[in-house]
């Protein structure tokens, strides 16, 4: 298995958090969520930050959290869905470790995101606006080292695919 961090990216509801926790357990690594880093540093929930200060303030906090992650090694990191899509951040993520895009079907990831609640990026947006956001982010996510299609798969299946992709990537580099 490759040394260094494994960084999970993808749209909200793609399974980054739940798959990241299981992946970290399977690899014997720590699990870190960028949103948790933001909450710990700021003292407010993500919805509170959005509501009180707006998205631009949240994106600044996200950039600070990303800088803090530069100190991490051999962890599994789950990013917020928008983190890779701003100000060269995908380049930073690629420097942190192997970036894995969890690519799911829009309807599927959106249904999961809505079920989980606390998604400020969904608030007040039409289905068309959310679809545009999803498709607008794909070009950023596509810069990942590895893409894992998650459509119709359960958590164990997704993690198995991530592990297989990481092994394959590591074998190709040795």
Where are these regions (language model features)?
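Short glycine-rich anion-binding loops that position phosphate/pyrophosphate groups of nucleotides
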Residues: 81-83, 105-107, 153-154
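ATP-dependent small-molecule kinase phosphotransfer cores
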Residues: 30-94, 118, 127, 138-140
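NTP-dependent small-molecule kinase module
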Residues: 1-2, 22, 26, 72, ...
């Amino acid at each position: 298995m490759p040394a260094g961090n494994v960084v999970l990216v993808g749209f909200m509801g793609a399974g980054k958090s739940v798959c990241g926790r299981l992946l970290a357990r399977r690899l014997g690594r720590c699990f870190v969520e960028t949103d948790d880093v933001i909450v710990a540093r700021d003292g407010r929930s993500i919805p509170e930050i959005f509501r009180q200060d707006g998205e631009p303030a949240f994106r600044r906090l996200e950039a600070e959290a990303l800088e803090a992650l530069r100190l991490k090694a051999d962890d599994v990191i789950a990013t917020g869905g928008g983190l890779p899509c701003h100000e060269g951040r995908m380049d930073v993520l690629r420097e942190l470790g192997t970036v894995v895009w969890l690519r799911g079907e829009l309807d599927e990831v959106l249904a999961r995101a809505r079920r989980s609640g606390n998604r400020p990026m969904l608030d007040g947006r039409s289905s068309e606006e959310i679809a545009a956001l999803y498709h607008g982010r794909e070009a950023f996510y596509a810069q990942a080292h590895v893409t894992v299609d998650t459509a119709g798969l359960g958590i164990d299946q997704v993690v198995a695919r991530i592990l297989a992709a990481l092994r394959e990537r590591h074998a190709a580099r040795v």
